[in-house]
Amino acid sequence: MPVQSVAELSAQLPVELPVELPAQFAHLRRFALDGALLLFDRDTGLNVLCEGEETAHLKQTAPRMVQFAITNSCNLACTFCSRDIKSNSDWTIDEAFTLLAELSHYGLLEVAFGGGEPWTFPGFAELVCRLYDETSLAVNFTTNGLALTTEDLAAIKGKYGQLRLSLYDDNDWRNMVAMLAREKARFGVNYLVTPERLKTLETTILELCELGCRDILLLSYNGYDQDMHLSKEETSALSGTIKLMAAALKGRCQIKLGVCWGEQMQSVPRLFNKADCGAGREFLVITSDKKIQPCSFHQVALPVQTAADVMNIYNKRRSELESAALMPGCSRENHADHWARAKREEEEEEEEEEEEKEEESVTAREDGKEAIAIQRPGGQA
């Protein structure tokens, strides 16, 4: 496929979006929602929502963003990671570029690279720059920071929307945050809130702010380790901490919540009150072994090769893409239901084991009686 310029790609965007706009918004990229029009500037991150009679006929026909696992390779071994560590890393730079350029033509606004660790993918900086220069996409990525250097930041300067730094106990995040702030990188941090981390959350948030971080995203745990999930009491305490910190740091630092919190954080003030996380509709995950998922925690994984494959699944398999993940923590299904089901399954397995033991015991007793009967004289049992 010959590479097309931004102007050529933009000129081929869907024709059903000829909504008249104020002059100051006319240059923004257009994205159709159901009954509304979203305007987007990839360089500033500006989003403008237009809604009225002029947009009532519009329908969303593409995901707004894809989360792209460019590689399954990682330089950390986190026990709670949701990715399948046995999955292949099948993408090349050219294949990834072609797929994303075509998805941009279908209307996609953003790509967020992850993995694995994207900076272990050979030529990642080249891919970021090429996507910015030759498509209309906003390019973002999530990293643990261990392989990211100041030279890498210089190579992609002005070419990415935002980088997100994941904070772990073993990735020297304090020095990394300080470096990103010093280099004036456009960044935020991702922080997984567990019962243990909740105890020091206020201190961590204040420290991040002091180091120069202006964007903190608090994530909930998705997985089968019940000790990593917050209790109702801990969730309530977290809500209080968020409200306190948001008020104290207003104008200095934004505190955000991951979509997987769902309705657990109802008491926390929100910019938008969305009832759904958007997985499978607002965004898709593209895996390192060329499959698409509604989200990285989801059991549905459908093989694709081209952008046409992606769009065909997106438009024709809505019920699968918008279903709840089976993994505990999904906001589409109360994770308490998962634990109740898991508990029932565990109890059923224990009952089956007890029944098997009882059957073995009965058989052993019967065998014993036969042996005794044979040994006794006179045929008496």
Model-derived segments and their meaning:
Residues 2-25, 31-34, 291-381:
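Flexible mid-to-C-terminal extensions adjoining Fe-S/redox cofactors in radical SAM and related proteins
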Residues 18-63, 76, 132-133:
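Recognition helices and adjacent regulatory flanks at domain boundaries
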Residues 42-62, 262-264, 301-315:
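Short, charged low-complexity linear segments at domain edges
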Residues 58-94, 295-297:
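Canonical Radical SAM [4Fe-4S] cluster-binding loop centered on the CxxxCxxC motif
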Residues 73, 77, 276, 329:
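The −1 position to Zn-ligating cysteines in a subset of zinc-ribbon hairpins
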Residues 93-113, 121-220:
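Radical SAM/AdoMet-radical enzyme domain recognition
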Residues 218-295, 368-371, 377-381:
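A C-terminal junction/extension of Radical SAM enzymes
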